[in-house]
Amino acid sequence: TGFILLYFSTKNLNFLSKILILLGTSVLVISFIVVGHSFSSGIYSQLLVIVHVICISYWVGSFLPLRHMCTINNCKNLHEVAHNFGVYAVIYISLLVITGLIFSYILLGGVSPLITSYYGNVLLIKISLVSIILAIGAINKFKIVPNIKVNQIDGKNKLKSSIEIEIILTFFVLLLTSILTTSLTTPLGV
């Protein structure tokens, strides 16, 4: 339902479209808390998941537009857009990591189940992949994006390649997330 509302809302960007985008986004976010472990873990966990999903949406949702900007010849504002993205990303990626760690701790009931349970092992792989994506993002922010100002062609090609790697790794993170959410029981039996 959420995707359908989002699809129709992009036809015209008037007031109704903005309402449909908000409604569609809300339906998508709520769907994450009514299916999976957060539903059984209480309202605090559900709020963590809502913040987590919103932050993921901002982060991952930027990949394709930024990648597209890298394919445009003589894209004059790529440096500015990528730089501003990096500034805001610090905020929502921090929230993403904090909410993810707290929610993981709630689901695991401690740190040791990361090593001693199958659920924890899969979660540890997911955390490792996210750490790699964060490292790539840091390289983008501090090395590649500043290079765009000096050498736009080289900088935008490197940023495009870097974003493509992030997209591939994100696919695997989302795959692991779906396995953790729907197929595995937490060490606490949730």
Q: What name fits each language-model region?
A:
Residues 1-190:
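Polytopic transmembrane helical bundles with strong interfacial aromatic enrichment
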